[in-house]
Amino acid sequence: MSEIGERVKKIVVEHLGVEPEKVVDNASFIDDLGADSLDTVELVMAFEEEFGCEIPDDAAETILTVGDATKFLEKNAKS
């Protein structure tokens, strides 16, 4: 997993309180990790803060899995 992927994983574990082993690229935030819509909004905000970038609403709607978040942030992260 990339350095950005590891940071994404850490944020997901902290925000959702899930076991690190469950946070894999194809894990759906809602279906696999038990997030609700508020959790997903909070995750997006945490990603924006951690990586110094804005995630527009239309992009946020396409970030459904850990891998989706990692791919988006690898392209758009400022830090």
UniProtKB/Swiss-Prot annotation:
Record PTM: 4'-phosphopantetheine is transferred from CoA to a specific serine of apo-ACP by AcpS. This modification is essential for activity because fatty acids are bound in thioester linkage to the sulfhydryl of the prosthetic group.
Domain of life: Bacteria
SUPFAM superfamilies in alphabetical order: ACP-like (SSF47336)
Carrier domain segment(s): 2-77
Position of the signal peptide: none
Keywords annotated in UniProt: Cytoplasm, Fatty acid biosynthesis, Fatty acid metabolism, Lipid biosynthesis, Lipid metabolism, Phosphopantetheine, Phosphoprotein
GO biological-process terms attached to the record: lipid A biosynthetic process
Record-linked NCBIfam families: acyl_carrier (TIGR00517), PRK00982.1-2 (NF002148), PRK00982.1-3 (NF002149), PRK00982.1-4 (NF002150), PRK00982.1-5 (NF002151)
PANTHER family, per database record: ACYL CARRIER PROTEIN, CARRIER DOMAIN-CONTAINING PROTEIN
Function per UniProt: Carrier of the growing fatty acid chain in fatty acid biosynthesis.
Annotated protein name in UniProt: Acyl carrier protein
Origin species: Bradyrhizobium sp. (strain ORS 278)
